[in-house]
Amino acid sequence: MSISILIPTKNEEVNLPHALQSAVGWAADVFVLDSGSTDKTREIAEKAGVTFVHHDWEGYARQKNWGLDNLPMTGKWVFILDADEVITPELRAELLAVAKADSVGENGFYVNRFFIFLNQRIRHCGYYPSWNLRFFRKGKARYEERDVHEHMVVDGKIGYLKHEMEHNDRRGMEFYIAKHNHYSTLEARELFKIERGMATGTMKFSFWGGPIERRRWIKHKLWPKLPLKWYFRFLYMYVFRLGVLDGVTGFHFCLFLASYEHQITLKLRELRQSGRL
């Protein structure tokens, strides 16, 4: 077993048992990197027999980079698993096969994930497939310095795995809404810093770059200048990306993320008016 799993947490007593159930028993080691839980997160981790480590919160990217730099991982490969995610049996078998072979040319792999929203799997809306770079050789990848929606930068070739993981935050809509309210604040701050030349992200954005760099260019250079972004996001997700085929749940999912887009717009406008973070 040559895979180490890192699970960042804070107050994840509802989600963590499901993530651990999908990770314990086959990985070389599992680390729960906690940033100050006041619920039963620690108790759940210790009962499962995994290593619980506290580290004060530094931000999404810095927290995970600290774990990669300081935790005594024994695996040659590392998988980053959020507490509200589950590694499916099919994905587990594929991860083990890659780690066992250890002769692949790739140093990192994108993993597809599917979202559960209001107890229904989202199959369209532009949220499936949803590729995340989560599996990589130890020492060959780090997260870019960014406040939110950070990407991993890999030294070497990158591949794609066939099987999926599940994303399902079981803490309910009240928490989900609060989380996205926080994310929209971070997104607005990031856009404001880019406009003012204050951004610290290590991943560049360019129309002529790779897929992520091109998407970043659209998101940071073109998208903020458009009017009615919330409307166009809803139209894109619900009509052009066939969210309508996800039924009533798809409608609510698209409308929720359109409102999230509008929150970013309002908060960025406020920052522009004040002229400071």
List each language-model region with its residue ranges:
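Conserved donor nucleotide-binding strand/loop of the catalytic core
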Residues: 42-70, 74, 101
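Short, structured coil segments at secondary-structure junctions
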Residues: 26, 47-49, 154
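Acidic helix N-cap motif at the loop->helix transition within catalytic regions
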Residues: 14-18, 39-48, 90-91
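Conserved beta-strand segments of alpha/beta enzyme cores
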Residues: 29, 51, 157-159
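Cell-envelope/extracellular polymer assembly enzymes that use nucleotide-activated donors
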Residues: 2-4
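A conserved acidic beta->alpha catalytic loop
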Residues: 22, 26, 34-43, 57, ...
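Catalytic-site signature of metal-activated, phosphate-bearing donor transferases
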Residues: 62-68, 75, 79, 88-272
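Short, well-formed alpha-helical segments that are part of the catalytic scaffolds
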Residues: 6-25
